[in-house]
Amino acid sequence: MRTSLTTLLIGLLAASAPAQDPPKQPDPLGPGDHTRTLMMGGLKRTYLVHVPKGYDPKTPTPVVLALHGAAMNGPMMVWFSGLTTKSDAAGFVVVYPSGTGTGPFLTWNAGGFTGKMAEGKADDVAFIGKLLDDLGTVVTVDGKRVYACGMSNGGMMCYRLAAELSDRIAAVAPVAGTIAIEESKPKRPVPVLHIHGSKDGIVPFEMAKGKSPPFMKLKGVEESVQTWVKLNGCDEKPKAEMISKDGDEMKVTRTTYGGGKAGSEVVLVVVEGGGHTWPGREPPVGFIGKSARNVSANDLMWEFFQKHKLK
């Protein structure tokens, strides 16, 4: 009898208890700039989102991840790249994540760091995966058209994402950044657009000849490009063309290795005399070298990205 009464009381209490509300869904994002935060490995991670002016939440929208260079962060990448303007014009969502480090000067765990620079590095591949999951709760993302571009260390991170997150990244466009990981084993062919200045003094074009910075172990530009030509099964004989005009201050060549598996390709754009810069944008400081004014990295990237989506 006592057991029956106890059971009855528990049942009555459960019935009278207020129902638990389901977890609140995040509010969808509208056009404009937004900041999102995530917890990863005990660290608070942030990323900025720019939703373009013409965004329609009923229509799946492409996403471009813009990864900053070393000693930078997401907000710095906004003005460094100028991709927000391109986002509004072309209609894609642009995301500016921040790496990890001390204060505002952050880096990506793209591989390649040696000595103390290699200690305690975050799992940034997992972070980008979680970021995309979170973004999908507030923006109508076209999962077949998620792209990554990046400057310097951010460009190196693009190569790592192509190798280790190829099931979610449709194509990559590293600028002034080469392969920093030992081995690349993508699950699928990933189209690559690599942009580099021939006079880059920070990530030199010919690093394969022993010119890497003392705290990093990197591949050279040609070695990075050829790695992905082979991984994608592209034609060994490329098509080369001049995309600058006669009389331009800097000559810009585009070399395309086409015919890759699943429609993939590898494209190398070289700015003759260009430094460690983002073509089409003024360099913030003089010592990083000259930037091309006659071509736009943002235009080249978007033209390239539009040709490729996950299949």
What residues fall within each predicted segment?
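Cap/lid segment of the alpha/beta-hydrolase catalytic domain
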Residues: 98-123
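Alpha/beta-hydrolase active-site loop
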Residues: 116-139, 160
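Bacterial N-terminal signal peptides
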Residues: 4-15
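Structural cue for short, hydrophobic secondary-structure segments
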Residues: 66-69, 96, 270
